[in-house]
Each structure stands twice: as structure tokens, then as C-alpha cells.
Amino acid sequence: KHVYVLDATNKYTPANLIPYDVLYTEGLVIEKLSSSDWGWKTLWNEEKLFQNTTIVIADINENGFMTGEASIGYAEYSRLERMPVLKKGKQKFIETYFNPKNSGITVDSLSVENEDADSLPLNQHVKFTEKTSSSGDYHYFSVNLFSGLEKNPFIADNRFSDVFFGRNQKYVLHGKFSIPAG
């Protein structure tokens, strides 16, 4: 059984997704008037996710300089969150989603697929460079590049409410990093 909530004020929400601002609230759902099968119900579809898939392939040289490519797929609510920013331009998208979360990374190019097909994942291909951090003879880097998981949401010393992310989430990360011998 599917629940459809149509919101004409948000042009990026497809009909198969409950708009995010009413997700997990209550609404008057009318199923069958003849059988009195209607009433106030929680607007929730556990099958629809905030879904990110990130594939990173990168090489790191002896000086700790990383060059690589990433393919990123944003589906369902993840796509929905990013579309308004993408419509403002690729540079604004890079400034919003890549630069603040991945400090030190330079995005050399960004290409986007399925921008106008709301039933398909928003796919991006990114070429990037980064100077890895170092301490003495060791170079280190985060494998969570472009995933949305760069910063830990649980590091606050004092929390004043329960953690509720607003929708079910699924993150898939694949990484292949080549490092110099030795």
C-alpha cells in the first residue's frame, strides 16, 4: 500500500516520495470513503531512503599528494536535498557539498547525469586532488571522501535531544587507494 502526498510548492519532490517537511508527521489519509477506511495516520514509508553511494579511486604519491576520481550516486531523499543547490549551478554545488566537508580537496571537474530524471539517482563524476595530512614520515587521509560522513555527528559533549535523522539512511562506500611502496 502506497501513501502519496503531493506538494505543489516543492518542484523537486517526485510523487513517489513523501515531502521531507511532512515526513513522520500525521496526515488525514482517505483510502476508501465507502468503507470508512480513513483517518489520521503517520506519513512514513520505510522503503524510501536517504541513499548515497560513493566510489573513490585515488593514487597517492611519495609526497602525500592524492589525485583521483569519485563516482557519487544520490538517490531518493539524498537526491531531493541536493537538487535545489545543483540548479543554482555546479560551482555553488561544489561550494556547498564538497568544499566545507572535504577541506583541502580541490575539485578539478564535476559532471552530472540524470539531473532531469527525478526517478533515477543523481549521478556525479568528480576529478579531484588533495594534499594529505602528515605527521613526521606518515601521511594520512579520510576514506570517507564525498560521502556525507566526513564529520562525526556524535562528537558533541552535551546533547539535549534524541538523535533522529528524519528518514532512513543508507550509505555505501567503496574505495581503492594506491599508495607508494615502502
Regions found by a protein language model. Name each.
Residues 1-182:
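A sensor for short, sequence-defined functional sites
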